[in-house]
Amino acid sequence: MKIVTLFSDGSCLGNPGAGGWAYILRYNEAQKKASGGEAYTTNNQMELKAAIMGLKALKEPCEVRLFTDSSYVANSINEWLANWQKRNFKNVKNVELWQEYLEISKPHKVVASWVKGHAGHPENEECDQMARNEALKIKDENKI
């Protein structure tokens, strides 16, 4: 199984409000970047969407080292998700996104690590800027 590194971040202008997501996917020297956004969303939804979109970009099963500044995403993946499934996601927010994450992550082995945001981590800073730009673009387009 290939070992890939996935850096992800989300941004939301208002919570809820216009939001953006971004990821950087790296395997050896190869790298892929992408970003997008939504007109009405939350910061947690965009953080999770960034990870989902990064996983969707993978073309084969991989061992994924996910780096996120969202403790919500990191803790959910590493600790809470299994119990949420057992409880049928009772009282869990963003169920549809978590179910999408579970489906897309099935072929992969994902380990999430939390990194402090806005602390000089180059890939996190780049993802943050990309996600924020998407949120600003959507805000301007929709005059939110």
Swiss-Prot record:
GO biological process per UniProt = DNA replication, removal of RNA primer
Give the UniProt subcellular location, in the record's own words: Cytoplasm
User: Which Gene3D superfamilies does this one have?
Assistant: Ribonuclease H-like superfamily/Ribonuclease H (3.30.420.10)
Output the Pfam families linked to this UniProt entry. Answer: RNase_H
Record PANTHER family:
RIBONUCLEASE H1
Cite the record's note on assembly: Monomer.
| HAMAP family with a match to the protein in the record | RNase_H
Protein name, as recorded = Ribonuclease H
Species whose genome carries this gene: Campylobacter concisus (strain 13826)
* Gene (UniProt): rnhA
